């Protein structure tokens, strides 16, 4: 899908660049594959703000997307591609041979009428097909990769993302991720072939603040323009630079400070995403 720009009738129209979604289905989603989604506004069950700068936005219906792909050896036909307001990628409605329907993440070059299949054995290497990493040819571009067998895909699910299978070692698959990280994943974990749809998502320009508000994003206020009671960078006469290394509102270092603390999975990371930056 291409990018779409508009005649400069207003300042926001002049700057607006969006993804042309003319090829997507224009109707409502399948009702049995949807759930209600209540707006949280960044609040928890106590009503306290736990995530700042969220709230408002258009009402959404949640689409139940099948990230597990455990319906083995039943061929499915793609009925249509749809927009999903809950993610940056597009989704595909699949009609299986046994009459069941499901939404899956749509990879690039998947179109209505295409056949897809998931299996615990080797199947054709074509977009949308799913199989264990141990059967996928080295060098393949993949997405929706499981980190634990049966848990469902967790890696490479966002628009335009993918991982590359670069090798195998003692029952483990070696993946290169978008971030530059090289990681070991068990060979029995499932992955889908292809890169995720909507690669132009990274090139859009909202054109105006209102388009962020429609998504439920509120203005992100900088610490240096707050009062001292609200932020460590706050206060001062006139404009100040904050006067210290950048910190969060709670005084923790930010802007590049590494926060990863899961030591138990360090052994699965062959190459850190930070190594290439040094």
UniProtKB/Swiss-Prot annotation:
Membrane-traversing stretches: none
Keyword rRNA-binding: yes
Pfam families noted in UniProt: Ribosomal_L2, Ribosomal_L2_C
A GO term, aspect molecular function: rRNA binding
An example Gene Ontology biological process: cytoplasmic translation
A Gene Ontology cellular-component term: large ribosomal subunit
Region: Disordered, residue numbers: 201-278
SMART domains xrefs: Ribosomal_L2, Ribosomal_L2_C
Entry superkingdom: Bacteria
Biological role: One of the primary rRNA binding proteins. Required for association of the 30S and 50S subunits to form the 70S ribosome, for tRNA binding and peptide bond formation. It has been suggested to have peptidyltransferase activity; this is somewhat controversial. Makes several contacts with the 16S rRNA in the 70S ribosome.
Quaternary structure and partners: Part of the 50S ribosomal subunit. Forms a bridge to the 30S subunit in the 70S ribosome.
UniProt-recorded name of the protein: Large ribosomal subunit protein uL2
Organism, as annotated: Sinorhizobium fredii (strain NBRC 101917 / NGR234)
